Structures are given as structure tokens and as C-alpha cells.
């Protein structure tokens, strides 16, 4: 038997249901009226802290034989020149993976293999991280390999062409064709940061990558991989000799780089919707907005708490996960983030470290849903976000989330690499002992203080939306019309679920009918 939640068509029934919807459950006080919408203004760039050149972060411990090294450069895709999008990421890849003056790329891999050593590079909007791990027995040889990638890169033309081809393939086939979830997230960046250096894909655009030359890469390396942009992280069995060796070798980098990019104010994207059209069986949904709030803001911890309640990445405790996946079977999972999130794959379900950003974003991600349920699922996410403004969490729910975070935040610092990353992030944000302070803040939060922060920072009116779907015109029409979005289930649902559905079906989506744009995914990130 199919269960269908519909909007009543008879006026009397509609009025009756509306009255019921406003009656609180027996014994509970009525919820306060919704707060007035928060101002949806622009977000200026407040500069990050700048550590001194080649600042050392040392976390020595004698109970491990593994040495961890982390070199974080204050450079990222914001440093890509106009028309050469992808230059920073390709430069970092070619230096880290393309061999050194002494060793070809293949020989570099052969040298690392018997050491069981790790060497990898990651580029984001403002930060590029070169990290390494090795047993202390192999440290002297590894240090030479590790630092030579920066000091004596091979810049092999064949490796340049190989890595550029990989980067082009990642845009044309990976981003556009194979990964609707990432496509939606990159689309959200493009929408909420339109006209800003954050807007383009970190890996580059098709035309940007095609325009690059090996000489571009060589010149860019001298401009941005410099001492004045570098923080050095060392952990494990670290002694004074290792610290001296690292700083001495890395002093071979250029002392000063290009001037920092002056980031502009981010214009509000409230109410905008971008639909990326492509052949696909499902609809991926991302929503969010740029926020002036970042680590160090008094509201950051309570807002992070609220969004953890809504849904930590891949955690079953989240409201969205339980309401949209478990109770309604809409998709695989639904999550919310207080700052930009990229999963640290291979190290749990946590956010990567060293994604420091001057202008952060808040986002909600719905894993792909059946197209017929896309608007309902989107409304559901907005409904449960708005509910946190309208009513505080119950004491039982509040204590559950607080207990979860007291333990879960310790997993964010369970490896030397993650501890180094957290410490380096704190330099830029000015938030020493960040996770300890978060756990201390949890002790003094209340349901009311969290609700107050949500009202100040998480107005649904600020949201912009991105969808990846095939029937773009049909979805656009639904978004523009604002009409209710009934849902049909394959199996019966409890009355309490259907009662909430009646509210979700009519939940206002803050989408402006004149700001719905359709873009073919086949041309996304072309230039």
C-alpha cells in the first residue's frame, strides 16, 4: 500500500490542518514566533593572521618512531592568474610528483617504496600542503627527497603533459560526468562566490589548463612557493637537529613571493538557484551561503553545535540523516557544515585540515535523491534548519549532541598529521588550542544560547541552491512556482511522519523566481 502526503484541496480542510499545525504537542508551550530574517548582506574580506616566514610548529613525542612533516604554503587557487585557472594546483602536483633534478618521477616512487614513506600534496583556495611521513630510520634519506621536490624540482616536460592531461580529465570526465555530488559542491562555490577568486574549481578550468605552459609553472613556483608564505610542521621523534636541518634546507626557497591577492567583498547570493543539467538518474542538492563568521567568532562554537545537531558528515546522530534518510528513505545521507568541508579521505570522515579561508561558507549537502523528490527533500532541509531558529533543542537532545561532540572532536586530532594541521590552522585564525576551547565551550552552552546564535547566523533567507539533474526545465518551473511538493512513499509511514510532511510540503523555499539559472554541465568550468 502506498502512502501519499498531499496538500488538502478543500478550503475547510486546509484551514483545519493549518490550525492543527500550529497546535503544540500536549503539555508543551507554544513555540516562539519565527525571528525576523537576518540581514543577507555582503561579506568583506577580513585578513587572516600571517605567521612569520618559515614559522616552526613542533609537536615532539618520543612514543612513536614515525616522523610527520607538514609544509603549508599560503597559496592556492586564488593565486591562479586570470585565464590560467589551475596553475597553482598543477604547479604543486608537478613539483611533488614529477621528480627531482636527481630522480625522475618513476625513480622518486622507487626510492620512496622501500621506506614505506608517504609524500603527497593538496591544493585548496588559499592553502597548499605538502605532507610526508616516514620511519625515523629512513629520515635522512627521506628529508633530501622531500625537500628536493621544492628546491630542485625536475620540471620534466613529459610529466607536465601527463599531469595536465590528468587535470583536464578530472574536469571533463570526473567533475562533469562521473561525480554529481562534487559537481554540486563546486557549483555552489561558483554560485555563492561569483566574481571572486574562490569561484573557479581548484583543479582548474578546461581553457585555463589548456593555456598553461611549462614556463608558466616554473615562474609560478618562484612566485608562490616561498619562505614568506611557509609554515613548517614537525611531529614525532623531533629533535633540535631535525628542526635545524629543515629550516636550513628550506632557506633555499625564494625569500619573498608575489604580493598577496587582495580578496574582494563577496556579494550576497541569497535566493539564487543554479541548475546544472546533465544526463543522470538522480538529483544532487547543495545549498549554502558565504558567512562573515569563522573560527574565533563568538558564534562559531554554538553554530557548529547546531549544525552538528543537523548533521555531522556521515554521522547517524544528525537530524537530517534521521529525518530524510532513516524515516523517509529519500537518499543515502544528508549533512551540514559550519565551515567549508572536504572529507579527509583515508583519515576517517572528518574535514581536512589546512583549508583555511578568509571568507568561509555554511553549507548543507543532500546526497542524490529521486528527481520527483528533489523539491520535497530541499524543503525538508530548509524546514529542519528553520526549526532550530523557532524552538530550542530539548534538554535530552541537547545533552545527546553535546556528549557526542565531547568525544567526536577528539577524533579530529588522533594523528600527528591532523594535530599539526589543527595547530597550523590556529595560527591563521588566531585560535590557539582550538579543540580544547571547543570542548570547554560545550560545557557552558545551553539550548537557548545555541538557538540565539542560530537566529543570528543561520537564516534560511541567506541560502543559495545548486541542483544537478536531467529535467532542468521541470525543476526550474517547480522552484519558480513555489507550489507545494507532495511526496509518495512505497510503504506506509507513521502518522507523526506524515504530519510533519504536511508542513514540509508547503515550506517556503527562499528562491527568487527571477534568479533561477540553467547551465549545461558539459560546459561547466570550461573557462
Tell me what each language-model feature is.
Residues 24-39, 194, 226-227, 231-294, ...:
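An aromatic/glycine/proline-enriched structural segment found at the starts
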Residues 30-47, 189-230, 257-265, 293, ...:
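Histidine-acidic residue clusters that define the catalytic metal-binding segment
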Residues 21-34, 109-220, 265, 270, ...:
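Acidic/histidine-enriched segments that form metal/cofactor-coordinating
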Residues 166-187, 269-282, 327-331, 335-348, ...:
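Short acidic/His-enriched helical or mixed secondary-structure segments at domain edges of catalytic enzymes
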Residues 53, 71, 89-91, 112, ...:
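Buried hydrophobic packing residues in well-ordered domains
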Residues 70-133, 199-203, 314-346:
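M16/MPP (pitrilysin/insulinase) zinc-metallopeptidase core fold and M16-derived inactive scaffolds
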Residues 17-19:
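C-terminal motif of bacterial Sec signal peptides marking the signal peptidase cleavage site
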Residues 1-10:
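Bacterial N-terminal signal peptides that target proteins for export
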